[in-house]
Amino acid sequence: MTDNSKTRVVVGMSGGVDSSVVAYLLKQQGYDVVGVFMKNWDDTDENGYCTATEDYKDVAKVAAKIGIPYYSVNFEKEYWDRVFTYFLDEYKKGRTPNPDVICNNEIKFKAFLDYAISLGADYVATGHYAQVERDENGHQHLLRATDSNKDQTYFLSQLSAEQLDRVMFPLGGMIKPEVRKVAEEAGLSVYDKKDSVGICFIGEKNFREFLGNYLPAKAGKMMTLDGEVKGEHAGLMYYTIGQRRGLGIGGGSKNNEPWFVVGKDLSKNILYVGQGFENSHLYAASLDASDMHFVNKLGEERGRDFRCTAKFRYRAQDVPVTVHFSEDFSKVTVDFDDPARAITPGQALVLYDGEECIGGGIIDAAYNSEKKMLQYI
């Protein structure tokens, strides 16, 4: 039996059930486990209530129960500088960013990893649902989790082989009900705590209200691509491609079909809308993405043109595509086998080869079958 007692694993503990079970399992396996609570955002509300304080209390309870030391580290400045300013800049450009992808790369597996190493860590572990495998040549591979409903490789697609070398994802081979069962049987007080959802720094707050605190909103015309004014928008940053809710337009022509956001014109401050879920302006034949990154060195060995599958939003199913990389592999054009709906600039494009996540980048633009740019951003 392997003696793990000399291997120190620092666990990123959020106070939730997933990371608590990670700490418990590693402790059971004999590792030298240390818990660390990351405070990335000051979420104190107008009544002085801070959810982070409650979460930290849960970390303390779990750590005491399983018998491990725990610390708290403040990454608010790093988060503001590396994640939140990016988030705001993208919204200023009329795009819809995914801060979780940046947070994982810059905070959880960079700032936190560096901090863990300063505590003598051999590895860090988190409650992410993903798997890491090393092949016979020493290359790290990022694989989907067993629980396809919880798989988080989409958010981990910007990690490097060097980062994965130091990472453990103990929940990768488990399904969520099993995780809760382990927590309950181990007597962990968080076994029935509800999962956190949405962007961490917004939490339960109203998104429109939150964004309005940081960026000035400028109302403007809401119109069809034929130039018919349908109403007024509250500010382009509040809308995303394919959005239906919150437009304030009834049916009308086309058998009372619902209206959707089909584009934005930043220079004229116009929000374009169209009727029908199947509206042709929502469907792309291809997209361009930049800031492309491969998880390991094997990515570039595939050549600049190859077949794979791609995912362009977290909850979407990945679809078959052909990719065409630029000479330095930093940009890519992706051709879809079948038209893809509501491709959104600013979101992450993530590439897969079967169960393996091979890398990803950020979507810049989408095009129809005639190579005309959609969304008019």
Curated annotation (Swiss-Prot):
Name the EC number(s): 2.8.1.13
Question: Can you list the GO cellular component terms from the UniProt entry?
Answer: cytoplasm
The protein's GO terms of the molecular function aspect are: ATP binding; tRNA binding; tRNA-uridine 2-sulfurtransferase activity
- Can you list the disulfide-bonded cysteine pairs? C103-C200
Q: Which residues bind ATP?
A: G12, M13, S14, G15, G16, V17, D18, S19, M38, G127
Question: What Pfam families does the record tag this protein with?
Answer: tRNA_Me_trans, tRNA_Me_trans_C, tRNA_Me_trans_M
Annotated region (Interaction with target base in tRNA) at 98-100
Site annotation Interaction with tRNA: residues: H128, Q347
A Gene Ontology annotation in the biological process aspect, one of them, is:
tRNA wobble position uridine thiolation
**Has UniProt tagged this entry with the keyword Nucleotide-binding?**
yes
Q: List the HAMAP family hit by this protein, alphabetically.
A: tRNA_thiouridyl_MnmA
Main function: Catalyzes the 2-thiolation of uridine at the wobble position (U34) of tRNA, leading to the formation of s(2)U34.
Q: What family name appears in the similarity comment?
A: Belongs to the MnmA/TRMU family.
Quote the protein name from its UniProt record: tRNA-specific 2-thiouridylase MnmA
Protein source organism: Pediococcus pentosaceus (strain ATCC 25745 / CCUG 21536 / LMG 10740 / 183-1w)
